[in-house]
């Protein structure tokens, strides 16, 4: 039996799981998520979204901030943010 995917809701408050952190690699000028014994590059809007995760603000508050900051429709921002955060929660990079 497979486990149901982790779906992040707008009321969820997320932070990085223990041992995981976002870091800018100045040499390569890329953002990476450092994890125990591995690291992976995050591109596009992902670094900006991940920098807003502070363990205090809800996902909905982050979506609202991004919609205002980028003058973009909230629904578009929400779809992308929820997809990214759900994927990273599924991979145990983020937790509630």
Curated annotation (Swiss-Prot):
Pathway in which the depicted protein is active: Cofactor biosynthesis; pyrroloquinoline quinone biosynthesis
Domain of life where this protein originates: Bacteria
GO biological process: pyrroloquinoline quinone biosynthetic process
Keywords: PQQ biosynthesis
Gene3D superfamilies recorded: Coenzyme PQQ synthesis protein D (PqqD)
Organism classification: Bacteria, Pseudomonadati, Pseudomonadota, Alphaproteobacteria, Acetobacterales
Cell membrane keyword on record: no
InterPro entries for this protein: PQQD, PqqD_bac, PqqD_sf
Job of this protein: Functions as a PqqA binding protein and presents PqqA to PqqE, in the pyrroloquinoline quinone (PQQ) biosynthetic pathway.
Single GO MF descriptor: quinone binding
Membrane-spanning parts: none
Family: Belongs to the PqqD family.
Name by which UniProt lists this protein: PqqA binding protein
Subunit structure: Monomer. Interacts with PqqE.
Keyword Glycoprotein (UniProt): no
């Amino acid at each position: 039996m497979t486990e149901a995917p982790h779906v992040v809701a707008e009321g969820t408050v997320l932070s990085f799981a223990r041992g995981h952190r976002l870091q800018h690699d100045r040499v390569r000028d890329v953002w990476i998520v450092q994890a125990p014994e591995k690291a992976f590059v995050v591109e596009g809007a992902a670094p900006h979204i991940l920098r807003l995760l502070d363990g205090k603000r809800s996902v909905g508050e982050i979506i609202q901030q991004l919609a205002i900051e980028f003058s973009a429709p909230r629904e578009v921002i929400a779809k992308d943010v929820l997809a990214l955060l759900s994927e990273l929660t599924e991979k145990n990079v983020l937790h509630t």
